[in-house]
């Protein structure tokens, strides 16, 4: 199993079960760190099992990475999946074509935009509307005009990426 995928799935299940957002973010950060390594660095850390020597990788995330690197499904992921309850509404969920109200970690949501769009694609959604807060809602980290422009650039890049996936 790919360690990045394992870490992101663990973050998803922790987020879904409303666990401590700091722990959720730790798994997302660890996924970003591993994803940022080139193949040679991954191989080097994998052979030496030295994941924890990387800044931002703690004992729990290192264990997940090691287990995934060795081809195992990480224990933490198995445990979270088995504890996950059915959210219900499967029939309605299957009929949904998209989502028109999404908050990312740019405001008061907990997931990065790219993960949200990847999940939407996996669910078969045809469209999504990102509805992060405006600057007036400072308590929710509303987007200033500058941050909104940056976010639109991110969205444009993802639009290109997911349009290629859909073709």
Predicted regions and their residues:
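Long, highly charged, low-complexity intrinsically disordered interaction regions
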Residues: 1-92
């Amino acid at each position: 199993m790919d360690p990045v995928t394992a870490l992101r799935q663990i973050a998803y299940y922790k987020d879904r079960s409303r666990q401590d957002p700091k722990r959720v973010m730790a798994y997302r950060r660890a996924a970003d760190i591993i994803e940022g390594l080139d193949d040679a660095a991954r191989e080097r850390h994998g052979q030496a099992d030295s994941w924890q020597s990387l800044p931002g990788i703690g004992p729990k995330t290192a264990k997940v990475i090691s287990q995934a690197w060795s081809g195992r499904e990480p224990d933490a992921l198995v445990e979270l999946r088995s504890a996950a309850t059915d959210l219900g509404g499967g029939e309605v969920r299957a009929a949904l074509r998209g989502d028109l109200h999404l908050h990312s970690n740019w405001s008061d949501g907990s997931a990065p935009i790219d993960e949200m769009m990847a999940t939407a694609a996996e669910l078969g959604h045809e469209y999504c509307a990102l509805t992060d807060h405006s600057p007036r809602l400072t308590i929710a980290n509303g987007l200033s005009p500058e941050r909104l422009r940056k976010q639109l650039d991110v969205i444009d890049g993802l639009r290109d990426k997911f349009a290629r996936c859909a073709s």
